[in-house]
Structure formats: C-alpha cells, structure tokens
C-alpha cells in the first residue's frame, strides 16, 4: 500500500491514511486517501472553519450586500476579507452604478457579543445591529447574517430574526447558519452557503434581460480579477455571463440564476452543489470546467463553444491569446525547467495546476496537498501526479518541515498562513489562494503566475540569507 507515515507522525499513526505516495502500479481508485475528517488532536494544521467557508469564500465577493457577523469581535475581524482579494466594479446589471466601489472589501458589521449576551441571549442585540446597519448603509440590496461558534452554542435563532427584519426593512435579510464548528473544514461552509442561496434566493427575481447565450459562471470568485479575464473571453465568443457565483456579483444575480441556458462550474469543490440543485429543479445543465493553464483553458472554451454553436469564435480567442503569451511562456520555461515545486492549495488548485506547471514550465511537481479537499479531488491529484509524488491531506506544520527536508522543493505554492513558515525554512512561497500579482486564470493569468514563481525563486535576497539550525548561544560548547 502506498500510504506513508512520516517520521514526525510516530505519535499520531492515524495520519498514515492521509498521506499517499503515487504509485502507478496500484489499481486506479484502490487507495482511498482519508480526508474531510476532523483534524486529529495534536496535529497543528492550517485549516479554516465553516464560517470562513461561507463568508470568506461563498458570499464575500458579492458587491451590494452588507455582512453582519453575529459574534464576539474576533470572528468579525476574521471575516473582514483578510485572506482573499475580491475586487468588484460598481456597475450593476440594470445599468445603474452602486455608490461604493469595492464595498464588499471595505465594510463589515459585527454584533460584538459580550459575556452578558452569551448568558442572556443575543437576538435582541442582533435586531438592533441590523436596524442600525440598514440606516447606515441604506443603499445595500440585501443583508446577510452569519452564525458563529458562540451564537451556535447559545442557540440564537438567526432564521427567526432575519425573517422579522426582512418584513420590517423590505429587503432580503438572509441567515447563513455555518458556525465554525459545523464541519471539519471550511468545506462545510461552502455547502451551507450553496444550499442557503438556492433555497432562499434562486428563482425569486427575474433578470433585466436575457439572451440565447446566457451562462451562470459558478465557483468563480474574481480573486485578483480572475473573473474579468474570463468575461473578456466569453464576450469575444458572443456569450453573456448572466450570473456569477459569486465574484463581482450582485445579490440579484443569485436570484435569477435559474434563467441561464448553461452553468459552468469552475471551483468544483465549493460550488458544484448549487449547479446540481439548479439543474434538478430548473433543468439548467452544467459543465465542470478548468481554466488554469493554456491547455485546460483552450479545452474548456472549446466545450462551451460547442454547446452554443460558437466553435469558430472559441478557436479565434484561443489563437489570439496563445500568440500573445507564447514568447513569455518560452522564457519562463527556460528559467524554471527542472525546478522542484510543491503545490499546497486548499482544494482543486492542487490538481488544476500540477499538469500545466509540468507541461508549460517544465517544473518537477514533487508534492501536492490540500486543506479541505474531498475524496474525488484526491483521486484527481493521484491521476495527474507522477510516480513518487507525495500527496498530503490536511498537512500539519511538522509534516511540512519534513517534506521540505526530504523532497527539497525550490518553491511552494501555498496560502498566507504557510508562506512565512516556508520562508523561515529558506524556501520561497507564492500565494495561490489570493495570489501575489494576479489574475492567475486563463492564458494571461498563467503567465502572471509563472512570472511570480520566477521572481520568487530568482529573488537575490535569498543569496544574502543564512539559515542556521541553532541560534547563536544555543550551542552546548
């Protein structure tokens, strides 16, 4: 069996089932990597909570809603866009202009629960805060309210409060019941967000206009402008993005997703749920798509073009974009060929990126890992990895250090929480969740990512640093 127990895990042997060494001799699907389970006590990992999954991923990118976090101040601060960059434009689907650009990145409201609220309940305080927030920001089109661990434990009824406030204020007030402890990872928050939006919003409004080429772009959160890259491709193909879920989206777009002709699911871990539900109830089919790297981007633009009879337009976009990026791709491949890389993403990016990085940059992917991926995602990592690649679910800090020592990656694509840990080990790191200098999607985005990888590896600062095993004065001499 190709499972592996790392040296640092001798006291938590359960970790063996979470760590896999790729061996193509094993029958496909024979080794089911353990994942999406509670972190083992004593294993210090980098996961986020269910609240982070719903607010930090699913709803945080919507441009015209106000977020009210029912919590002590810590959770409110945590939910204030600290890990993602979700820019928005002020233009609205009906041609109007939202009064505050990047409103979703600038404002969040919390109930600032105290010990007294925990003892006596915080529902009256929540109502007061929603009323005050509505007066302060009367132009928002909806208010989203979030449960957290504290309010989940004391049993505050957010649904009842939101129903009352919606009737009073005359606008949608939506409760998202994903307290941090609701699941083992942020993935539970994705799930709750999908189902809440579908049950409470989808089908409740009609779009200003429709066309025969309308799509929902689901699981695209416009990290550092990713959506705007894809929007340009679709515009050139004559395809209209009717609704986004949820990058640069409006509240209304979520309500009329049922009117699209096709849904495209980009982040397949966080947003396939809502696409399935829309298909089941409204008959809107969906395609799972991948726009990371030139080959996958071209394949999926062709698939969309074929669905709408826009094959010629798709080929024109692919040809134009490849001609623009090929010289830069050739340069970065010449500089990065053979460099060892570890892709440590939250979920799908670990299998989205492994092949393009090998194919177009010539790099050697020695390790893959995920924080909240499910079994199907790890199967894709295993399929796309070469023999000998280590694949880790929910890696802890000591495991990361051991993998660096044994596999010697020259760069890590990871998150902000791990970035400076790897720096202390002398390994450059590029943020793959929220990016360094994005966008990273599509043809031009892949070049941006290659540039950031090149810049990180060849940064002359690394030559000026010494990484010692012992601090001065720690010797026993």
Swiss-Prot record:
The keyword Iron-sulfur applies. It catalyses: N2 + 8 reduced [2Fe-2S]-[ferredoxin] + 16 ATP + 16 H2O = H2 + 8 oxidized [2Fe-2S]-[ferredoxin] + 2 NH4(+) + 16 ADP + 16 phosphate + 6 H(+). GO terms for molecular function: ATP binding; iron-sulfur cluster binding; metal ion binding; nitrogenase activity. It comes from the Archaea. Keywords: ATP-binding, Iron, Iron-sulfur, Metal-binding, Molybdenum, Nitrogen fixation, Nucleotide-binding, Oxidoreductase. Its cofactor is [8Fe-7S] cluster; [7Fe-Mo-9S-C-homocitryl] cluster. Binds 1 [8Fe-7S] cluster per heterodimer. [8Fe-7S] cluster binds at residues 49, 75, 149. Its EC number is 1.18.6.1. GO terms for biological process: nitrogen fixation. Tetramer of two alpha and two beta chains. Forms complex with the iron protein (nitrogenase component 2). This molybdenum-iron protein is part of the nitrogenase complex that catalyzes the key enzymatic reactions in nitrogen fixation. Belongs to the NifD/NifK/NifE/NifN family. This is Nitrogenase molybdenum-iron protein alpha chain. The gene is nifD.
């Amino acid at each position: 069996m190709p499972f592996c127990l790392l040296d640092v895990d001798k006291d938590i042997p359960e970790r063996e089932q979470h760590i896999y060494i790729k061996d193509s001799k094993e029958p496909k699907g024979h080794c089911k990597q353990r994942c999406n389970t509670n972190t083992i006590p004593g294993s210090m990992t980098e996961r986020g909570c269910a609240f982070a999954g719903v607010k930090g991923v699913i709803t945080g990118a919507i441009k015209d809603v106000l977020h009210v976090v029912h919590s002590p101040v810590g959770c409110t601060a945590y939910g204030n866009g600290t890990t993602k960059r979700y820019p928005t434009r002020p233009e609205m689907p009906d041609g109007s202009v939202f009064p505050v650009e990047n409103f979703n990145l600038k404002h969040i409201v919390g109930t600032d629960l105290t010990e007294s609220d925990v003892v006596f309940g915080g529902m009256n305080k929540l109502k007061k805060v929603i009323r005050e927030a509505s007066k302060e920001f009367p132009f928002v089109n909806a208010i989203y309210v979030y449960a957290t661990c504290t309010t989940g434990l004391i049993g505050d009824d957010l649904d009842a409060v939101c129903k009352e406030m919606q009737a009073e204020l005359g606008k949608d007030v939506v409760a998202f019941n994903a307290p941090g402890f609701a699941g083992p990872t942020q993935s539970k928050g994705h799930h709750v967000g999908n189902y809440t939006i579908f049950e409470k919003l989808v089908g409740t409004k009609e779009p200003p206009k429709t066309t025969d080429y309308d799509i929902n772009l689901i699981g695209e959160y416009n990290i550092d402008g990713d959506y705007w890259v894809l929007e340009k491709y679709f515009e050139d193909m004559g395809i209209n993005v009717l609704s986004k879920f949820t990058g640069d989206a409006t509240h209304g777009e979520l309500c009329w997703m049922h009117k699209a002709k096709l849904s495209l699911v980009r982040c397949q871990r966080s947003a396939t749920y809502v696409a399935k539900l829309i298909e089941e109830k409204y008959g809107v089919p969906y395609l799972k798509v991948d726009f990371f790297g030139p080959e996958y981007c071209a394949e999926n633009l062709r698939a969309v073009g074929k669905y709408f009879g826009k094959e010629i337009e798709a080929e024109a976009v692919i040809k134009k974009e490849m001609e623009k990026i090929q010289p830069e791709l050739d340069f970065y491949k010449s500089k990065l060929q053979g460099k060892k890389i570890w892709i440590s993403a939250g979920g799908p990016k670990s299998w989205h990126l492994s092949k393009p990085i090998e194919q177009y940059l010539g790099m050697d992917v020695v390790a893959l890992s995920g924080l909240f991926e499910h079994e199907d995602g790890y199967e894709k990592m295993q399929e796309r990895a070469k023999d000998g690649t280590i694949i880790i679910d929910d890696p802890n800090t000591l495991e990361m250090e051991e993998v660096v020592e044994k596999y010697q990656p020259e760069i890590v694509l990871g998150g902000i929480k791990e970035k400076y840990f790897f720096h202390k080990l002398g390994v450059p790191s590029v943020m793959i969740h929220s990016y360094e200098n994005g966008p990273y999607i599509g043809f031009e985005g892949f070049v941006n990512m290659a540039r950031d990888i090149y810049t990180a590896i060849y940064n002359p600062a690394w030559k000026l640093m010494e990484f010692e095993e012992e601090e001065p004065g720690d010797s026993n001499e």
